Amino acid sequence: MRKLALSDEILMKVDKPARYIGNEFNSVMKDTSQVNIRFAMCFPDVYEIGMSHLGIQILYDMFNRMDDVWCERVYSPWPDLHEIMKQENIPLFGLESQEPIKDFDFVAMTLQYEMCYTNILQILDLAQIPLRSRDREDGCPIVIAGGPCTYNPEPIADFFDIFYIGEGETQYGNLFELYKKAKADGLSREEFLHEAAKIEGLYVPALYEVEYNEDGTICCMKPKYDDIPVKIKKQVQVDLTNSTYPEAPVVPFIKATQDRMVLEIQRGCIRGCRFCQAGMIYRPNREKKVDHLKDVAAALIKNTGHDEISLSSLSSSDYKELDELITFLLDICKEKKINISLPSLRIDAFSLDIMQKVQDVKKSSLTFAPEAGTQRLRNVINKGLTVDDIMNGSKQAFEGGWNKVKFYFMLGLPTETEEDMRGIPELANDVAALYYDTVPKEKRAGKCQITISTSFFVPKPFTPFQWARMYEPSEYLGRAKIVNDHVKEQLNRKSIRYNWHEAYVTVIEGILARGDRRLCDAIVKVYEKGGYYDAWTEYFDYDRWIDSIKECGLDPDFYTMRERPLDEIFPWDFIDIGVTKQFMIREWETAHKETVTPNCRMRCSACGAKSYGGGVCYEN
């Protein structure tokens, strides 16, 4: 019988001790004498958020189907336990075995958000693994990173031995085979990493050198050896239908942030929103066959006991077999009183019939993302959404019995003017007025409630807006104030609620998103000063970040306030995502002409993703 890593005394001291004990329903236990590879799958945030992440569930299931691999889960300890583990010298452990992960073969992290970078160091520190790759000796685990943040791995390059660029289903088997052979042949850590760098999609940062110009921009980046690639090619699982998927995912003991079954219906997006990194890095769009999804949904319901199923996709409305899938789900879910969640709906593709069936009893609020307050700016960002689309979709919703609508917008987008900012509350006011004009008083479900939320735009790598500048926190807050003041001037202001994102976090996120390798030292400084859980408002300290960056001889404005010239070499230019830089430049220029590029089903825009040989590129 396994022994818990934490004593009862410690568990009674900390918040939500169930975060740390493992043994949840559908978790996997194995005999360590029967496996060759022990793999720690880490999420650098709290348990409840990490347990909501589909990517970890997919890889956990895939690895544990391999007879000689045991994959365990690790989440960032909450600050209360962090302090105890440091004081009592308790090494970070895997949930399943409760054994220290410093003794595992691999420690991997999925990186979803730049503000979790200090938690990378927290995990390594608590695990008693050297923070920097160069300080790890032959007995240390191989430390790997994957996920969307690895599309610019440079600000965290010092902390990882390997970055896995792309979708995890494709190359881990080859990496494991290489590792077993390297162990059998007695290869050193350095020799193994050299061989790993030859596997397509794997980037070993220690084997690449970066040279800088006098102005701080990158001059060049080159491999140290001739037998490793100059460009790292993103990995894509072209056939999603026949790839691995967890039909019996781990069910947490405590409520997770997304406490539901997740059914991935497609990957990628046919839309080309110019601010959206996910829409670019997950190209080409690939759909799963509906009959397969029906089988998976039935298995999830049987194996989990959750009372809600969510369809995972960047744009659910664009899944071609959505009607058939929803009809099937309604049939099997109604009897079991299971709710169906449809995130990522486009207001122009809004299906009242589907939504009325899904929410035929309880009319929860509907959420849409126009992103910009005027048609001009929506054209700039390639949202492909008109005022008529928004008003017609809202009218259908009101006629269907809804009275609560949430709209998401961004402030600080390229070319934004005060007119665009003022357009946000004006649009909300028009939608509220439409409710009172459309729904007779006796049929109203209550007062109309329009919630508008604004985040501040952060330029991300591999988007057409990767050249854009950012602003000081005071400028962002000034833009939010313009929106807030104009809300108060609207005729239907009592029906409008406005909230906005934290401006100071936005600036640091922007620095990390487009940063270079020189920022590694700054991240270490932030952690050494007590910074971690920076994604959480109560633990974030803007001055600590800015001071640490400056102490490393770097100028924060260099990373945020500049609009980049088109010929600048980016820290991430050594990665090949299929979508070409020429396409990005064309889209950047098209944005400034306020011109819309059609979606992938309407017309191929020759972005380059067709090179992967599948998906929407080959539908016609």
PLM regions: where:
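Conserved SAM/AdoMet-binding glycine-rich loop
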Residues: M41-C42, V46, M115, D295-T451, ...
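A short beta-strand-loop structural module common to alpha/beta enzyme folds
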Residues: D67-D80
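Radical SAM enzyme core and accessory elements
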Residues: M1-M29, S33, F39-M41, E489-N620
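Canonical Radical SAM [4Fe-4S] cluster-binding loop centered on the CxxxCxxC motif
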Residues: H53, K255-D291, R603-N620
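N-terminal [4Fe-4S]-dependent radical SAM core
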Residues: I10-A40, Y47-E48, P205, E211-Y212, ...
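N-terminal pre-triad scaffold of radical SAM enzymes
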Residues: F39-D45, F63, P249-Q277, I301, ...
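Short secondary-structure boundary/capping segments
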Residues: I56, E88, L124, D158-F163, ...
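Glycine-rich beta-alpha loop elements in corrinoid/cobalamin-binding modules
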Residues: P77-P223, P464-D516, I523-E538
